[in-house]
Amino acid sequence: MFEAVEELIGEHADLEKKLADPSVHADQANARKLNKRYAELTPIVATYRSWKQTGDDIETAKEFVADDPDFAAEVKDLEKQREELTEKLRLLLVPRDPSDDKDVILEIKAGAGGDESALFAGDLLRMYLRYAERVGWKTEIIDSTESELGGYKDVQVAVKTKGGQGATEPGQGVWARMKYEGGVHRVQRVPSTESQGRIHTSAAGVLVTPEAEEVDVEIHANDLRIDVYRSSGPGGQSVNTTDSAVRITHLPTGVVASCQNEKSQLQNKEQAMRILRSRLLAAAQEEAEREAADARRSQVRTVDRSEKIRTYNFPENRISDHRVGFKAYNLDQVLDGDLDAMIQACVDADSAAKLAAA
């Protein structure tokens, strides 16, 4: 059933030998790569060995049933255990997203709906900050443009695991959970500015990209155009009298990143480069996916109410994820960061689709 695992066992043994060689660790980047692959294969190898041993134990127990009927109960228990190991191994063999261990850059953009959309973008920001707090992640607002009523026209946040270097265990990074948040989020509610009590519909867009390390993306200095300008706050009010804001354009691709929140031009440049690296990595991955027959759908790039992935209905206290048919009536709790059930529904649907395609 799991013939392909034998090849993985050989690769695992080969990696173990390499990692035991001190000279391998002289190249830290290569050693990290080998360690990562070894950590990915270890649970597969361990589960397969347990699965195989359980099969042998079942055959042995069956041989004793004729002489001692008590072994029939043991056979039943072992068969149940083997079924559980079979399913666990199937899930472990689902093709992994290579970015699942990474931290992310989260961007929320106000869209259709004007001021109400900007206020909703602020609600989404608070929801994600609360979720990160619940699961023990670290957050840092990189750049933001506030609206006049206190919402956000645009906000970018770095979300990291506790160590700030991605996941320590395979598949446990921020991207593994947060990648399902990318798309258009629609809200239905009575705005605070509505005097007639009418329900309005507006939308905000969420873009999630894995945060790239310098080794992930090669950027040449002569491919960049760096512009500096004066920072401004909500309503166009000046918050800085020097040209400290930075906009970086990657000329070969046209990808742009900017930052104005930091106090100095150097700090803004560093943050803008951080965003640019992540966007270039995401663009490269999407291009690879298109060439691989669109194995994973790209995130929504336009904030259009018709392209929604999720609806937040305040009058009914209802949250709906239209991709997986998830629906719950605890919107107040979701907006306070209780996202686990909804995200898990997306994880399960994604795993099922990958299993079916494997």
Swiss-Prot record:
Gene3D superfamilies tied to this protein: 3.30.160.20, 3.30.70.1660, 6.10.140.1950
UniProt keyword Protein biosynthesis present: yes
Protein's cellular compartments: Cytoplasm
Matching PANTHER family: LD18447P
Major place of residence: cytoplasm
Family of the protein in this entry: Belongs to the prokaryotic/mitochondrial release factor family.
PROSITE patterns: RF_PROK_I
The name this protein goes by in its record: Peptide chain release factor 1
Function per UniProt: Peptide chain release factor 1 directs the termination of translation in response to the peptide chain termination codons UAG and UAA.
Classification via Pfam families: PCRF (PF03462), RF-1 (PF00472)
Single GO molecular function: translation release factor activity, codon specific
Native source species: Streptomyces avermitilis (strain ATCC 31267 / DSM 46492 / JCM 5070 / NBRC 14893 / NCIMB 12804 / NRRL 8165 / MA-4680)
Entry keywords, A to Z: Cytoplasm, Methylation, Protein biosynthesis
